[in-house]
Swiss-Prot record:
Annotated InterPro entries: 4pyrrol_synth_GluAld_NH2Trfase (IPR004639), Aminotrans_3 (IPR005814), Aminotrans_3_PPA_site (IPR049704), PyrdxlP-dep_Trfase (IPR015424), PyrdxlP-dep_Trfase_major (IPR015421), PyrdxlP-dep_Trfase_small (IPR015422)
Protein known as: Glutamate-1-semialdehyde 2,1-aminomutase
GO MF terms, alphabetically ordered: glutamate-1-semialdehyde 2,1-aminomutase activity; pyridoxal phosphate binding; transaminase activity
Family: Belongs to the class-III pyridoxal-phosphate-dependent aminotransferase family. HemL subfamily.
Location in or out of the cell: Cytoplasm
GO terms for cellular component: cytoplasm
Pfam families noted in UniProt: Aminotran_3
UniProt organism field: Francisella tularensis subsp. holarctica (strain FTNF002-00 / FTA)
Length: 431
């Protein structure tokens, strides 16, 4: 794509008014070595169009929410009807009840749900609730799992799994994260060691059941069930962060695939149909501790606003239709199979995997196990950056980070998938 001038000009202007020129760091394309990002003008279906009128097949989908594709006609119509009746009331509305009922119907492990405005708000609230319910302070998270930008989650492992949390962002006091313990994903020994040392102090484990913020790493056989068991043994809560996987890998989320019941679940992305929304829910006994039913405070000016609720209701209605996830999964599988076959044809060190409408790209042989954050760091990250640049220049918009999962929508056509595979095949051949 030769014409990128308007994006370049806009990025230079944006940097004068917005820190780094973007409102979320990954959007700057800095992690993939690009000088500037593409500024998007509009989107429709499986495509993004930038301010220079370049067209891209979109495999980000606004980082997951756009499971129906951009500007789905039914979702737009529902939103437009609601807009005429008001944007936000600051009072309860029927749409909140309807969306809550739909979520509980599709995720039976959730008995009650509270709406917030983002995934970060959802995880913050779930952790606060878990601490209050257990009367304990320490939490366990996993290296490489992202749960939003709250202070208590911005923690690196330090020198070993037993280290107390050390902040990895300036502005996060050590006292804030001293109760955040970090374990290694898929490593039960690291979890057991933490429980042995802090047995009666651990309020909860929070985990992405499929780690979508270190590309796409699946839990090894029995890992999630073992987390459930060790939480039960120690009267700690298990929180599944399904902001990314909820209604994306399956209609009932990852918990329905692995048949493991969390105490609390956090949601976002798909449940808002592209509008800002998050939620946390779980056992009624626990959720009844949330204000005003109980003492655990949580509030939000725009929480449960009718626009986001309406978009979520229509989105969940559509993805609940028989055969939806079969079709979505088939699209992702076709993409992944084609990429793997292309890499194999040229003996290129690459493999891809998928589940539902989510996929991961790994620049290493399929004979190399990638089960942890450390494993992912050993893959060819430089080659991913080259692949990203090549695909972007040829009209395929991938996540601008080797640590992020990709997303496919029901709007992607066979032609879109075939074009993507053909471009990748050419890259594998030339590199």
């Amino acid at each position: 794509m030769e014409n990128k001038s308007n994006s370049q000009i806009l990025f230079a202007e944006a940097q004068q008014y917005i820190p780094g020129g973007v409102n979320s760091p990954v959007r700057a394309f800095k992690s993939v070595g690009q000088e500037f990002p593409r500024f998007i003008k509009f989107a429709k279906g499986a495509y993004l169009y930038d301010v220079d009128w370049n067209k891209y097949i979109d495999y980000i989908g606004s980082w997951g929410p756009m499971i129906l594709g951009h500007c789905d006609d039914d979702v737009l119509e529902a939103i437009q009807c609601q807009v005429k009746n008001g944007l936000s009331y600051g009072a309860p509305c029927k749409q909140e009840v309807d969306l809550a009922k739909k979520i509980i119907e599709l995720m039976p492990n959730i008995e009650q749900v509270r709406f917030v405005n983002s995934g970060t708000e959802a995880t913050i609230s779930a952790i606060r609730l878990a601490r209050a319910y257990t009367c304990r302070n320490k939490i366990i998270k996993f290296e490489g799992c992202y749960h939003g930008h709250a202070d208590e989650f911005l923690v690196a492992a330090g020198s070993g799994a037993l280290s107390l949390g050390q902040p990895n962002s300036p502005g996060v006091p050590e006292d804030v994260v001293k109760d955040t313990l970090v374990a290694s994903f898929n490593d039960m020994e690291s979890i057991q060691a933490l429980f042995e040392k802090y047995k009666d102090e651990i309020a909860c484990i929070i985990v992405e059941p499929i780690a979508g913020n270190m590309n796409m790493i699946f839990p090894q056989d029995g890992f999630l069930a073992k987390l459930r068991a060790i939480c039960d043994q120690n009267s700690s809560l298990l929180i599944f962060d399904e902001v990314m996987t909820g209604f994306r890998v399956a209609l009932g989320g990852a918990q329905s695939i692995y048949n493991v019941k969390p105490d609390l679940t956090t949601l976002g992305k798909v449940i808002g149909g592209g509008m800002p929304v998050g939620a946390f829910g779980g056992r009624k006994e626990i959720m009844q501790k949330v204000s005003p039913a109980g003492p655990v405070y949580q509030a939000g000016t725009l929480s449960g606003n009718p626009i986001a609720m309406t978009a979520g209701i229509k989105t969940l209605e559509k993805i609940s239709q028989p055969g939806f996830f079969d079709e979505l999964g088939a699209k992702a599988q076709k993409l992944v199979d084609g990429l793997n076959e292309a890499a194999k044809a040229y003996d290129f060190n690459f493999h891809a995997k998928c589940l539902g409408g989510m996929f991961g790209l790994f620049f290493c042989s399929d004979k190399i196990a990638v089960n942890t954050f450390v494993d992912l760091g050993k893959t060819n990250l430089k080659m991913f950056n080259q692949f990203f640049a090549y695909m972007l220049d040829n009209g395929v918009y991938l996540a601008p980070s080797a640590y992020e999962a990709g997303f496919i929508s029901i709007a992607h056509s066979d032609e879109d998938i075939e074009k993507t595979i053909c471009l990748a095949k050419k890259f594998f051949q030339e590199n």
